[in-house]
Amino acid sequence: MPPKQQLSKAAKAAAALAGGKKSKKKWSKKSMKDRAQHAVILDQEKYDRILKEVPTYRYVSVSVLVDRLKIGGSLARIALRHLEKEGIIKPISKHSKQAIYTRAAASE
């Protein structure tokens, strides 16, 4: 078997650049979603807004209150219990993970 031919440094560099290997995938930089700045303490303004707006909703749940009123989940659960106790909303389905309510005047 004849000996291998020695390549110059320039030839080796050119062979390396010629490729054959796939270039690595560049991960696209997606825009990061901003952290939600929901209220965690209920002030009078939010309380009045809950009493005014929630009875008009046909479907009321924790996630609806969090989205529309920009309050935290724990505040939304407390508000729903308070509104149910006052008779403003009535439960449709109560589950350990998700409670669903509707306005009390809808069925009357």
UniProtKB/Swiss-Prot annotation:
Q: Which regions are flagged for Low complexity bias?
A: 1-20
Record's subcellular location: Cytoplasm
Recorded GO MF terms: structural constituent of ribosome
| Ranges of Basic residues composition bias in the record | 21-30
- Which biological processes are named by the entry's GO terms? cytoplasmic translation
Name the InterPro entries for this protein.
Ribosomal_eS25 (IPR004977), WH_DNA-bd_sf (IPR036390)
Stretches for region Disordered = 1-30
Which positions make up the signal peptide? none
Chief location of this protein within or outside the cell: cytoplasm
Is Ribosomal protein tagged as a keyword?
yes
Keywords for the protein's UniProt record, in alphabetical order:
Cytoplasm, Methylation, Ribonucleoprotein, Ribosomal protein
One cellular-component annotation, GO:
cytosolic small ribosomal subunit
Similarity comment: family membership: Belongs to the eukaryotic ribosomal protein eS25 family.
| Subunit record text | Component of the small ribosomal subunit (SSU). Mature yeast ribosomes consist of a small (40S) and a large (60S) subunit. The 40S small subunit contains 1 molecule of ribosomal RNA (18S rRNA) and 33 different proteins (encoded by 57 genes). The large 60S subunit contains 3 rRNA molecules (25S, 5.8S and 5S rRNA) and 46 different proteins (encoded by 81 genes).
Please explain the role this protein plays, according to its UniProt record: Component of the ribosome, a large ribonucleoprotein complex responsible for the synthesis of proteins in the cell. The small ribosomal subunit (SSU) binds messenger RNAs (mRNAs) and translates the encoded message by selecting cognate aminoacyl-transfer RNA (tRNA) molecules. The large subunit (LSU) contains the ribosomal catalytic site termed the peptidyl transferase center (PTC), which catalyzes the formation of peptide bonds, thereby polymerizing the amino acids delivered by tRNAs into a polypeptide chain.
Extra remark: It is presumed that the precursor part of S25 is engaged in assembling of the small subunit, thus being essential in ribosome maturation. Present with 162000 molecules/cell in log phase SD medium.
- What PANTHER family is this protein classified in? 40S RIBOSOMAL PROTEIN S25
Q: What is this protein called?
A: Small ribosomal subunit protein eS25B
UniProt organism field: Saccharomyces cerevisiae (strain ATCC 204508 / S288c) (Baker's yeast)
